[in-house]
């Protein structure tokens, strides 16, 4: 039984973000559709060749997407919302872009589809929309075309297809409500047609992704798998593919399916290999997801070998990445600024392919010398002073319950804060950032490249902060911000100023569409060598008599939007960040900053996939926030901000944060999100966002007043703040001024009654 290797998918964007540049050029009308398609062909050919050269046996085809793979599947099935359809009923790449972005070079603009997180990753997918009575048919042949492309290049191909049950699970019903699972029988004929076409092309194995099988699914959804896969069997061999968690809780459902193989994530799941081997049908292939597709760390291949060696020769076996390598940067070799020691600890997508080749060869031959050589830097890292800081570890171990408690309860603090700030009813503020103009971005870039000295850079930033204060005073806002001109990204900025993080030059990963992010990497214990935000906050406060908020990104968000260490728990990392930022709160307070905002937009999105694991996560997530904030005195007002999400199932935890004021995104839900706070009888102050900053549209005074009156029916007016939904970084100054002027006017009208 020869062991093969494969990946579940490969990054799409290109080493230099070629796909992003081609997409945005096409959207702007600066290049043709054919030029865009040519970039896609070139990237696919390059990525297949790179994987093959790195030693991958079976190449994934169908993992490439022009915007998002869930959206690609929707088009494959003919699932195009009516507002995005071409008049002649055809489907083309602009149809896809209209669904993803709301507009494209051709066709009428229409509201984009909803976007949300892909399971518990930082990748986003476009949510399929379902309406009663809709029809499905094969309308978008991208998968088949790309299989033809790869076969023509002589590759050994393994098509990748998102499975029918997971695709339905990820979608939402629009309009008249019905059970979306009832659509399953309507989409199966399209899947049958696709599998038949693949069989005609001589395809042996198809990777059919059903990550929903790692969730705690309702019984009706689990029951749907058997009839679905009964309908799909027989044309090609199916590798049922799961990831992001283990499958043991749903293994009875899985083993009843007529498939020929199962892929399991042996990195994030707690599945026992021996138990899997015992319970899987003996003629099934097991694809062992041993190499972490979601992180950047070199694998301990001697450990991975030991994990799987006992079943070698006992069943058909492949070794693989735990999930698609989409979530990893492409190539470590182009990182020239990382020092040799730190660089030796990492493996990006291409290096992970090499790891799979080494592992396959060792399992086939029994010779593990190459594995030991590869794993040597991991042993060295365990003892590196870059990783371990005894002072941080000692401080973390000394945390007591008192460290996460404010001195007094909210009611006492609120009285002290009212006496200090004397704010009017319906106080107005913004969430933190102001427009990042071309001038600001150029200033930062010139400084980063060494084209501008520190003095001139600081003078430039100070001028932009001064402008932000002048603008806010002119508008009549009550609580001001400094505008964050010095910050490129709310996580990267803090990572750059904390020990324990490193940054890459080209470590880009796709977030959605053409948006890529370059997450910081946590390599060791985290500490704050010097104050981070104090100087600019103090300067901004010196320009005005009104309170200026200090602005921090919270510990859970910094954790969730970084590549974490694997040698300590996420809880440990979050609490180390919390302790570092606790010192920042104390220093801001000492500098005269009386209102400090600690943003936690990622608190909810960091939830584990299984609800049974939520309590433990929320307990340490809340504790980390409180450690960060609890050093503040009674008359220092702590704010937090959370982006658009469902709050009702975590209201206990939101209240437990004990922030004096929480600002939330609510305008898109027409204040309906406040229902959770009303039902819970949330005791502290709330700033429900009164307009959507993602749109350039300027809300009218009447619109904002109406929303605030609606909010006051749910939350007592004396506990309401008036603010936009989110930061204003991506907006231009003209619409920002106009929208904020109307917001301030609406608040003033309500004060007059």
UniProtKB/Swiss-Prot annotation:
Pathway: Amino-acid biosynthesis; L-methionine biosynthesis via de novo pathway; L-methionine from L-homocysteine (MetE route): step 1/1
Binding residues for L-homocysteine: 431-433, 484, 599
GO cellular component terms, A-Z: cytosol
Cofactor note: Binds 1 zinc ion per subunit.
Top-rank lineage group of the source organism: Bacteria
A molecular function GO annotation: 5-methyltetrahydropteroyltriglutamate-homocysteine S-methyltransferase activity
Active-site residues (renumbered): 694
Keywords, sorted A to Z: Amino-acid biosynthesis, Metal-binding, Methionine biosynthesis, Methyltransferase, Repeat, Transferase, Zinc
Binding residue positions for L-methionine: 431-433, 484, 599
GO biological process: homocysteine metabolic process; methionine biosynthetic process; methylation; tetrahydrofolate interconversion
Annotated positions binding 5-methyltetrahydropteroyltri-L-glutamate: 17-20, 117, 515-516, 561, 605
Top-level class of the enzyme under EC nomenclature: transferase
Phenotype when changing residue 643 to S: Impaired activity, lower affinity for zinc binding. Binds homocysteine 7x tighter than wild-type
Cofactor(s) listed in the protein's UniProt record: Zn(2+)
Extra information: Has an absolute requirement for a polyglutamylated folate as substrate. Its activity depends on phosphate anions and divalent cations.
Known role: Catalyzes the transfer of a methyl group from 5-methyltetrahydrofolate to homocysteine resulting in methionine formation.
Family: Belongs to the vitamin-B12 independent methionine synthase family.
Name used for this protein in its record: 5-methyltetrahydropteroyltriglutamate--homocysteine methyltransferase
Species annotation: Escherichia coli (strain K12)
